[in-house]
From Swiss-Prot:
D-ribose 5-phosphate binds at residues 200, 224, 228-232. InterPro entries: PRib_PP_synth_CS (IPR000842), Pribosyltran_N (IPR029099), PRibTrfase_dom (IPR000836), PRTase-like (IPR029057), Rib-P_diPkinase (IPR005946), Rib-P_diPkinase_bac (IPR037515). Binds 2 Mg(2+) ions per subunit. This is Ribose-phosphate pyrophosphokinase. Pathway: Metabolic intermediate biosynthesis; 5-phospho-alpha-D-ribose 1-diphosphate biosynthesis; 5-phospho-alpha-D-ribose 1-diphosphate from D-ribose 5-phosphate (route I): step 1/1. The keyword Cytoplasm applies. SMART domains: Pribosyltran_N. Mg(2+) 2 binds at residue 175. Its cofactor is Mg(2+). It is found in: Cytoplasm. GO terms for biological process: 5-phosphoribose 1-diphosphate biosynthetic process; purine nucleotide biosynthetic process; ribonucleoside monophosphate biosynthetic process. Its EC number is 2.7.6.1. It comes from the Bacteria.
């Protein structure tokens, strides 16, 4: 006797609008699951439909408030495991704690590894995420991890909205660590590549020391994975403007926007900022545009479900 395991998609509270778009792409309704709080603030998860023997895709970015959303995710995984789900694939569009992926100095924790351990022990059987800050985090897990790249989504949108002339445009990596990410975008758009050489005197503070590449009289596309406080991207834009950049467009997968980041962006040399909807925001300024990665994630889920290649999405 053979059984076809039904697929169901559920969402926590972190980014329900994105989860609804993903479910819509898959021609599914979001599963009925309540994630609330007890009187003392503890998280309460109630699954209101059967999931026994089903393949579950659970959508929950661990964005700010990071600890609240992470605990929601862990408790939801545990609830589905104890309800006898066949598989539990967690879709974490934004992976919190990803920047704590190594010991930068003595006695530092490696929190990204701890989070990976927690997700695995809770009962996840697969992880799907978007633009991990450090791709080696995939190796922190002993379960399959699919790290989706957002650059095709950005490239398609930029070609639609901006007058991109490859010979007059340059993609800029905001630091040496982001060169591979920026190179993918440059190859997609057919542009040249430049790099900002930065130094970090302290956390969330960066100083541009040198610009490697030609940016004078060019439209600059700064491409990064995260905008947090926006100190780095604003300082970078200022250096590029001083070097003769004609126009500055910033693209970042994850708009965290901590500590007056939006105010800094509004008052900066950046003309337009593009982010994705991995993190939910309301009432963003006119300068900030949101591109959805729902179809990208939805297609990846469909391919995983059908045992098809995910990597061919980026060829």
């Amino acid at each position: 006797m053979s059984f076809s395991n039904e697929m169901k998609v559920f969402s926590g509270n972190a980014n329900r609008p994105l989860a609804e778009k993903i479910a819509n792409y898959l021609n599914l309704q979001l599963g009925d699951c309540e994630v609330g709080r007890f009187a003392d603030g503890e998280i309460n998860v109630r699954i209101n439909e059967t999931v026994r023997g089903h393949d579950i895709f659970l959508i929950q970015p661990t964005s700010p408030p990071v600890n609240e959303n992470l605990m929601e995710l862990l408790i939801m995984i545990d609830a589905f495991k104890r309800a006898s789900a066949n598989t539990i694939a967690v879709v974490i569009p934004y992976y919190g704690y990803a920047r704590q992926d190594r010991k930068a100095k003595g006695r530092d924790p490696i929190s990204a590894k701890l989070v990976a351990n927690l997700i695995t022990v809770a009962g996840a059987t697969r992880v799907l995420t978007v633009d991990l800050h450090a791709e080696q985090i995939q190796g922190f897990f002993d379960i399959p991890v699919d790290n989706l790249w957002s650059y095709p989504v950005f490239a398609e949108e930029l070609l639609k909205r901006e007058n991109i002339v490859p010979e007059e445009t340059v993609v800029v990596s905001p630091d040496v660590g982001g060169v591979r990410r920026a190179r993918r975008m440059a190859e997609r758009l057919g542009t040249s590549l430049a790099i900002l050489d930065k130094r970090r005197p302290s956390d969330n503070v960066a100083e541009v020391v040198n610009i490697i590449g030609e940016v004078e009289d060019k439209v600059v596309i700064m491409f990064d994975d995260i905008i947090d406080t926006a100190h780095s991207i604003v300082k970078g834009a200022e250096a590029l403007k001083n070097a003769g950049a004609k126009r500055i467009i910033a693209c970042a997968t994850h708009g965290v926007f901590s500590d007056r980041a939006l105010e800094r962006i509004e008052n900066s040399s950046i003309d337009t900022v593009y982010i994705t909807d991995t993190i939910y925001h309301e009432n963003l300024p006119e300068k900030v545009k949101v591109i959805s990665v729902a179809n990208l994630i939805g297609e990846a889920i469909m391919r995983i479900r059908k045992h098809l290649s995910v990597s061919t999405l980026f060829r």
